[in-house]
Amino acid sequence: MEMREAYIERQTKETRIRVKLNLDGAGTAQVDTGIGFFDHMLEALARFGYLDLEVAAEGDLQVDPHHTIEDCGLVFGQAIREALGERRGIERVGDTLLPMDEALVQVALDLSNRPYLVWDVECPEGMVGGFPVEMAEEFFRAVSVQAGITLHIRLFSGKNRHHILEAIFKGFGRALGLALRENPRFQGVLSTKGVL
């Protein structure tokens, strides 16, 4: 199979985001978004998905972290889409149940080229290390739309914001890694239509 890599850069009046992605990596990450907790989450996502990920983001953090977080999701999603190519010879779907202390999260996804997010997460409002809790949903919506992923995220239990968010990011990485696995038993796309 060909190299599944991408480099995407996006610049607006609010942000400048650069993402380099290797879907067949070892889980290494170099992330600098200016939001320490968000960096930690993206590093965890990469580690649990065995992705090599580089993210460099400059944003209007003096205003709010919203633009930086959402735009990172947009560019990361675009990088996934580009690196996937025609989505041939992969498992396509991935599902994981991931615990972190009292938090238990399920993430199920389909690299279907049909973007859709179901966010069934009741997380205590507030901030974690400069990261507004509600921005996790916006990040994953942006990833889903840009990458063409049907994505379901469900929280079964949890009280600690940090634990809940970390379980979500790790769970997404794990489910994505499973969906990206190559399957030598077929060469085309896993679809009765023959295309995604």
UniProtKB/Swiss-Prot annotation:
Pfam families in the record: IGPD
UniProt main location, coarse: cytoplasm
GO cellular-component term (any): cytoplasm
Domain of life (superkingdom): Bacteria
Ranges annotated as spanning the membrane: none
Any one GO molecular function term: imidazoleglycerol-phosphate dehydratase activity
Keywords, ordered alphabetically: Amino-acid biosynthesis, Cytoplasm, Histidine biosynthesis, Lyase
Catalytically driven reaction(s): D-erythro-1-(imidazol-4-yl)glycerol 3-phosphate = 3-(imidazol-4-yl)-2-oxopropyl phosphate + H2O
Principal EC category: lyase
Coiled-coil intervals, chain numbering: none
One of the protein's GO biological processes: L-histidine biosynthetic process
EC number(s) recorded for this UniProt protein: 4.2.1.19
InterPro entries: IGPD_sf (IPR038494), ImidazoleglycerolP_deHydtase (IPR000807), ImidazoleglycerP_deHydtase_CS (IPR020565), Ribosomal_Su5_D2-typ_SF (IPR020568)
Pathway named in the protein's UniProt entry: Amino-acid biosynthesis; L-histidine biosynthesis; L-histidine from 5-phospho-alpha-D-ribose 1-diphosphate: step 6/9
Subcellular location: Cytoplasm
Family that this chain belongs to: Belongs to the imidazoleglycerol-phosphate dehydratase family.
Designated name of the protein: Imidazoleglycerol-phosphate dehydratase
Species name: Desulfitobacterium hafniense (strain Y51)
UniProt lineage: Bacteria, Bacillati, Bacillota, Clostridia, Eubacteriales
